[in-house]
Swiss-Prot record:
GO terms for molecular function: electron transporter, transferring electrons within cytochrome b6/f complex of photosystem II activity; electron transporter, transferring electrons within the cyclic electron transport pathway of photosynthesis activity; ubiquinol-cytochrome-c reductase activity. It comes from Chara vulgaris. This is Cytochrome b6-f complex subunit 4. Belongs to the cytochrome b family. PetD subfamily. Signal peptide: none annotated. Keywords: Chloroplast, Electron transport, Membrane, Photosynthesis, Plastid, Thylakoid, Transmembrane, Transmembrane helix, Transport.
Amino acid sequence: MGVTKKPDLTDPILRAKLAKGMGHNYYGEPAWPNDLLYIFPVVILGTIACTIGLAVLDPSMIGEPANPFATPLEILPEWYFFPVFQILRTVPNKLLGVLLMASVPVGLLTVPFLENVNKFQNPFRRPVATTVFLIGTAVAIWLGIGAALPIDKSLTLGLF
């Protein structure tokens, strides 16, 4: 929590404390040594202890053992790879699919240069960045949902 009160340097009590080297008590606790030597290690070690405790008391099983003679019909990646998987699955040329995936970060890197005259942080005053974000989010969700569907319904999501 930050200090919101500015010190009054004309206050004789504060001036006496500052002369004795006790000024930090007026402003709050110092970060060194209290936070860095006592509070942070307790939080870090407590987090590690909770993680190890959960791993020992409730271990997560990896899953059922693999059966090499029973392959599923369609192998899907993890959910966060669904949009990329959908691009590779629907684009006929694999090189074009890889170039499409590489164009996403390149396109995102060009957004600040397209809108470099706008110094505002309010998203409503940055229409290019807001439009790129909204369209990119909609496309990523569309591709992610489509990747979980069969290939014939993947682009239309079965709606059309």
